[in-house]
UniProtKB/Swiss-Prot annotation:
This is D-ribose pyranase. It is an enzyme of class 5 (isomerase). InterPro entries: D-ribose_pyranase (IPR023064), RbsD-like_sf (IPR023750), RbsD_FucU (IPR007721). One of its GO terms (cellular component) is cytosol. One of its GO terms (molecular function) is D-ribose pyranase activity. The lineage of its organism: Bacteria, Bacillati, Bacillota, Bacilli, Lactobacillales. Pathway: Carbohydrate metabolism; D-ribose degradation; D-ribose 5-phosphate from beta-D-ribopyranose: step 1/2.
């Protein structure tokens, strides 16, 4: 049995397989996932697990060079935006319309669905390189 880090086998496998500039997405319970995009559904109940719980655990094992967020998070969920900025203080942020963020999920290696119930709690992580 694995002793530490990400214990969910699907999430651990996706993170371990990420290369430089690959994309991984994490989102709220309501985010539609395009056909063909691997969906890892961790949602157990409302707010279980939360978006930030999953993001923080993924960040322990994945180098991030850039993130993509919906423009709408600035006005509709500024508290979550601040949480994201605190978790990724030195990472470039690119904002785009929510409709474009949804379309870009098709380019991600996987979408991790959380139990998050706050609007626009969705992110695309662009993998960095550790050397």
């Amino acid at each position: 049995m694995k002793k530490s880090g990400i214990l969910n086998s699907e999430v651990a496998s996706v993170v371990a397989g990420m290369g430089h500039m690959d994309w991984l997405s994490i989102g709220d319970a309501g985010m539609p996932v395009p056909m063909g995009t691997k969906k890892i559904d961790l949602c157990v109940d409302k707010e279980l697990p939360t978006f930030m719980q999953i993001l923080e655990n993924v960040l322990k094992e994945m180098k991030i060079q850039k993130i993509y967020l919906a423009d709408e998070i600035k006005d509709q969920n500024p508290e979550q935006l601040e949480n994201i900025k605190q978790a990724l203080p030195d990472v470039e942020i690119e904002f785009m319309p929510h409709t474009d963020l949804k379309k870009n999920l098709a380019k991600t290696h996987a979408f991790i669905r959380t139990g998050e119930m706050t609007p626009y709690s969705n992110i695309i992580l662009e993998s960095g390189v550790t050397f």
